[in-house]
């Protein structure tokens, strides 16, 4: 039977036999009939190929392909067998379930059983595996690389050994060093750089100062004081009232016309006479003759008596001013008096000198009542000198600055805004600036604009907006009481000036009603005002009514506390005992008091 099969195969595959003729066919029939061993079979198979030398490789590949196919068939059959076994196990497990009756009703139909399983898994929840977790092991694919691919694979895997190329019996320099080493050698061959410490740069040309910087330097620079010798300081302290510091009035000491100025001021005010000058000179001679003399501290009774005498002198001065107002009505005389009177205000940077006590001298002067916004210049008296000294050194009193008061007001305004959160319409209108923050009745639209308060930064209407003079210098350097009352009552002073002044025609009984305490407070308020010369650069700004009231209350309270603190400090200084020394100019050393010592 094998012979017949081989004969049929030879007819199919022997396509060259027809050309050779009947002789070849007879030879093949003989060879087929004469198959005895495997060698004959191999010869017949090799005869099928065009070249017999390729027969081993060709039939090896055929055998490998057949073997791979049989292995695939074997694995496929084993998978089918294992799947059947798994299905049988699943059927046995599902017989005890509730769904076994449903499967029996469906008569074990495959599609129905699979559908029920899918629905059950969907109800219970199915966890799908990712594609990467799947174990997919395909069969190895056989391929043959081209010579180029084989060479590239060897280069990638570095399966090679390079031979060094010799030039004249030595390796060329290009192959000795890498590119990085060549660059480093080139850098090293260059001349060395100079170190940074040895370099000398040209000085930068001075930049010209701008106008803004020059103005700021002028503002920050302190007022230059004229130098005064210690001899003149001691002589002036013996002549003038000892409670007043020399730094508050330098014009009476440094100039040679100082006795003349003192005499003129005393003639205008009717206070000092030639007798006071003689007493002052005799006291100076006694002080120079005696080296040191211990002064006894005054008792409380003496202090009370001196205060009562000062109050009586104030009563007399006010009564004389109301009784004879025609003395100052002459404008020429007023101009002369104001020209001869020394200014009361001096900057805080001036340093007061140590005080020395002398028996109090009574002075009677004619005073004129003026509104609070008009600056009053008077000759230096004992009480005014004390207030000026205390203005430079406020004792036991916290003076708030304009910046601090502005911050406090803004915080209070924010807290006041939070009260209207329950009223959403009012709150949103106030927050967006569409409603007046003071009266809360005037709404702003496209035609009615709002004014912004420069103190609390809130929009207000025209009726709630007032004018106020605020300093253009940094707020942190100015105390709050420097804003008033000339800054607060600027509009009121204009309206008062239009009305006829009735202060000169007041009866004596109306003046007597004022207490001495109120007069002293008003006088100290006038003394604490900023002079008009320093308020010229202040600009008029828009401030709301609430902020203006808030500022006025703070100013009044701060001034009241400042007056009380100064009064306590003055009484404390009166009860202290100290030495009066007449040392030479070389031994003289003026003592300075700091804020912490006070």
UniProtKB/Swiss-Prot annotation:
- Residues with Phosphothreonine modification: 351
- Positions of the UniProt region annotated as Disordered: 1-30, 194-213, 248-327, 341-379, 488-508
Q: GO annotations under biological process? A: actin cytoskeleton organization; actin nucleation; behavioral fear response; cleavage furrow formation; dendritic spine development; establishment of meiotic spindle localization; formin-nucleated actin cable assembly; Golgi vesicle transport
The record's subcellular locations are:
Cytoplasm, Cytoskeleton; Cytoplasm, Cytosol; Cleavage furrow; Cytoplasm, Perinuclear region
Bilayer topology reads: Peripheral membrane protein
Q: Record's Gene Ontology CC terms?
A: cell cortex; cleavage furrow; cytoplasmic vesicle membrane; cytoskeleton; cytosol; Golgi apparatus; perinuclear region of cytoplasm
WH2 domain location:
147-165, 211-228
Report biased composition (Polar residues) as residue ranges: 248-289
GO molecular function annotations of the record: actin binding
Q: Which UniProt keywords apply?
A: Actin-binding, Cell membrane, Cytoplasm, Cytoplasmic vesicle, Cytoskeleton, Membrane, Phosphoprotein, Protein transport, Repeat, Transport
Every copy of the KIND domain together lies at: 1-73
Acidic residues compositional bias: what residue ranges? 15-26
Question: Keyword Cell membrane: yes or no?
Answer: yes
Keyword Cell membrane set for record: yes
Give the main localization category: cytoplasm
Instruction: Give me the stretches of Basic and acidic residues compositional bias.
Output: 354-370
**Entry's free-text remark on domains:** Binds to actin monomers via the WH2 domain. The Spir-box targets binding to intracellular membrane structures.
Protein known as: Protein spire homolog 1
Species this chain originates from? Mus musculus
Higher taxonomy: Eukaryota, Metazoa, Chordata, Craniata, Vertebrata
